[in-house]
């Protein structure tokens, strides 16, 4: 019996961007599922930290329209691979939402330093609604139809 086709969407993946345990699970689970014979891919935002890293990423020719209420925004798709696996990682680029993290300036993936406090970005809900919708727009470009989107 053939394995499942799984698309794992995560705001962070160890080896690419990490603030906590979610990133560890988002890297380990796809590796394990792939080793068990399932076809797996990961989708995540393309953060500034990934661009600054030595992680090899490949720009694709795919630009996805992403409906957001009455607006249609666009994102470009990049591709990489999860280390020590055959699992592709699709990186969703939309600079206004994801190109703001810079630890030297007190800005992380989800929060910024403000005075002596860390505060969430005011548009976090919108940023990750966009990401969720972009993942749905990504599906036709995967080369497989997922049985599970997680």
Report the location of each language-model feature.
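Hydrophobic anchor at the start of a short beta-strand
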Residues: 38-40, 89, 146-147
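Alpha-helix N-cap/helix-initiation motif
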Residues: 15-23, 120-124
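A conserved catalytic-core segment of Leloir-type glycosyltransferases
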Residues: 1, 46-142
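Hydrophobic/aromatic beta-strand patches that form the interior of the parallel beta-sheet core
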Residues: 7, 41-43, 90-92
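Short amphipathic alpha-helix
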Residues: 22-32
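Structural motif
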Residues: 5, 147-148
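Nucleotide-activated donor-dependent transferases that construct or modify glycoconjugates
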Residues: 1-19, 44-46
């Amino acid at each position: 019996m053939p394995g499942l086709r799984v698309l794992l969407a995560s705001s962070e993946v160890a080896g690419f961007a990490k603030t906590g345990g979610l990133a560890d699970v988002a890297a380990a689970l796809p590796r394990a599922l792939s080793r068990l014979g399932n076809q797996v891919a990961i989708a995540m935002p393309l953060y500034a930290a990934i661009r600054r890293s030595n992680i090899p990423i490949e720009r694709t020719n795919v630009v996805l329209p992403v409906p957001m209420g009455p607006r249609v925004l666009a994102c470009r798709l990049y591709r990489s691979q999860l280390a020590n696996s055959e699992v592709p990682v699709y990186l969703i680029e939309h600079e206004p939402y994801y190109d703001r993290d810079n630890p030297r300036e007190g800005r992380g993936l989800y929060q910024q330093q403000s005075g002596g406090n860390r505060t969430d970005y005011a548009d976090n809900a919108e940023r990750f609604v966009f990401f969720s919708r972009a993942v749905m727009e990504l599906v036709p470009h995967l080369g497989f139809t997922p049985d599970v989107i997680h």
